[in-house]
Every structure is written in C-alpha cells, then in structure tokens.
Amino acid sequence: MTHDVLLAGAGLANGLIALALRAARPDLRVLLLDHAAGPSDGHTWSCHDPDLSPDWLARLKPLRRANWPDQEVRFPRHARRLATGYGSLDGAALADAVVRSGAEIRWDSDIALLDAQGATLSCGTRIEAGAVLDGRGAQPSRHLTVGFQKFVGVEIETDRPHGVPRPMIMDATVTQQDGYRFIYLLPFSPTRILIEDTRYSDGGDLDDDALAAASHDYARQQGWTGAEVRRERGILPIALAHDAAGFWADHAAGPVPVGLRAGFFHPVTGYSLPYAAQVADVVAGLSGPPGTDALRGAIRDYAIDRARRDRFLRLLNRMLFRGCAPDRRYTLLQRFYRMPHGLIERFYAGRLSVADQLRIVTGKPPIPLGTAIRCLPERPLLKENA
C-alpha cells in the first residue's frame, strides 16, 4: 500500500506532525516507522505553557503526565518562583495519542534505506509514500556548531512525601563541575519525583553512572529515601552557530529532515517540543496532495526564518560557552533570572523583542566587554566544522 505521508522515527517531532496532519487532514494515510520495540519510557518532553500556541496547549494538556501552575529556580545569590505554567509529556502518552488519531505506528521496523519516495526495510519490504520526513534524531552537521546539555535523571518513589510542590527548573546551588551544572526536579506526585543532574559542557561525553550517582546524592541531601523506578539520559545540542541556508542546500534532495535532525530546538535551553509543534503546523497547513518536495520547501522556509530569529540566542550561547569560565557559567543564568517575568517567558518561547535583547545585555556586563565583543561573530565558529 502507498501511504500519503511516511514519517521515519516515532519520537516527538514526527508524533506531533502525525497529530497535526490527522487533525487537519483526516483523509491522509500517515505511517510512522521506528526501529524500537515500542514507545520509550526514557524520554520526558517538557515546556512552559506560553511556549505553545493556544491550540497546541489545548491539544497536549490532556496528554501530559503532569501540569503545574508555577515553577522555581535557585542560584547561590538568587531564588525565584515564577507563575508560569509548565508541563511534561512522555513517549507512551504521545504514541497512544498518535494511534488514536488514526495514524499507524509500526514498531520493530529497521530502515535500511530512506529516500524521497519511501523506505526499504532491512527485511527487504518496500514502503512507498507521497511525502517522506526523517525524524530519527540529531546528526552532526558542518553547518551547526554546538555545545552540549548532558543529563541523567532518576525517578524515585519516596518513602515519605518529598515536599516539592512545583518544578525546580534549575537548582544551581550545587557544586559546579563539567561546565554549568544544575539539578532539575519534576514532582509527579507527592511521593514520585524525577531528579536530573544536568551539565552545560563543551564535550558530549556522558558518564551515566556518575551523573546518576550525583542525582541520588542530591536526593539524600534533601532527606529523601526510596526506590529508583525509572532512569533517563540525554545529550542535547546547544547551538553556538548555525548556517540554516547551507544546511538546507545540503538537503535539497532525499527525505526531509525534521526535529533534532534538522536543528529544530531552542538554541539555549535545548527544548524541542515548542519548535516541533511549530513545524507540525507548517506540515499540516499545506494544501493539496502531500509531496516530499513541497514539504521540503515549506519546512526549509520555516527553518531559515527561525534561524534568523534565533541569532541573538546563539550569541548568548557563545557568551556562555566561549566567553565565560566553565565554573562561572552559572552567573550568567543567575543574572538572567533577575529579569522581568514577561521577558523570561518570551525568552523560553523564542519571541524576544529588540527591547528584550537590549535589556539582557545592558547594565553590568556578566563577562568582560572585550570578551563579549569577541563572541559577536558567528561565522568563525562554523569554520571549526569545515
């Protein structure tokens, strides 16, 4: 059977594309292929409520594992509670919603060849489609220079209520090591909490055992005892420099990359859910029979515009990674979280105004002026990948 849209990978980006397509065009036959045996319990996708359009927030809120009305941060010289909603989605809930929408997911499907017309599985089966998108995770690109956000999280069932009422987006009062380090907390119930040791590092190597042990150490320091029920890990790109036009010139043929594979993530935070929702809207908004090249053009236009709007965010990353000593990186975030509430929300949503940008860099500089000036050019960092 020929499908209208074939999505390689059944993760976040393609899951949201499937939901959007089936909602906008219920006549389309949408197929997702993934090599895994089923949805992973090793992924938690979170975002702030204002990061999403009202339609996407309404669509995803019922699917979320948890929703919270507020959040907080903690630094050595500053702590703050923010009245901004926050929520988390897991792989099982997303996969279930995709199937209920009428799209098909085929697990245990190892793709040997993916092209603009379809996929050939390792078993020899050929699947044709009108449009083919590739959302099988991040790949290095000479057009994208990155640092890394690395984490290992342990979810524990505590013996007694842990007493954490809201997400702790960053607890940077911990010892700084391997770059900017903080603990991220998600309290899913009074006795269930995810504790994630996170590092903003120059290198992408991840010592799972060490970071898991650090997460357990944090729990003990809080007086929490209990059993580990789940673990997750991640190595996310943090964009320092990006040539979107060059990237898409390299992808002028073949399947269309989406998700992390296309560099669709918030440059500073690494959050990918809001950008995935925006791309899903682009895909679902096209009229007529779906075609790989038509989708390529629309997604490329979105990508180039998004990269242009994110230039300032990449500058902030260059200041963080190239302009600040690793053990002092936390001071930039500590200063940022003294900014107005609305500015912080717009930062996470990728909607900073020019006035917001000036507010962030005005005043006592977080790094020496000469160092900041050296961080301005983006092109030299791309040459590192040449």
Swiss-Prot record:
GO terms for biological process: carotenoid biosynthetic process. Keywords: Carotenoid biosynthesis, FAD, Flavoprotein, Isomerase, NAD, NADP. It catalyses: a carotenoid psi-end group = a carotenoid beta-end derivative; all-trans-lycopene = gamma-carotene; gamma-carotene = all-trans-beta-carotene. Its cofactor is FAD. Its EC number is 5.5.1.19. One of its GO terms (molecular function) is oxidoreductase activity, acting on paired donors, with incorporation or reduction of molecular oxygen. NAD(+) binds at residues 4-34. Pfam families: Lycopene_cycl. Pathway: Carotenoid biosynthesis; astaxanthin biosynthesis. Belongs to the lycopene cyclase family. Catalyzes the double cyclization reaction which converts lycopene to beta-carotene. This is Lycopene beta-cyclase. The lineage of its organism: Bacteria, Pseudomonadati, Pseudomonadota, Alphaproteobacteria, Rhodobacterales. The gene is crtY.
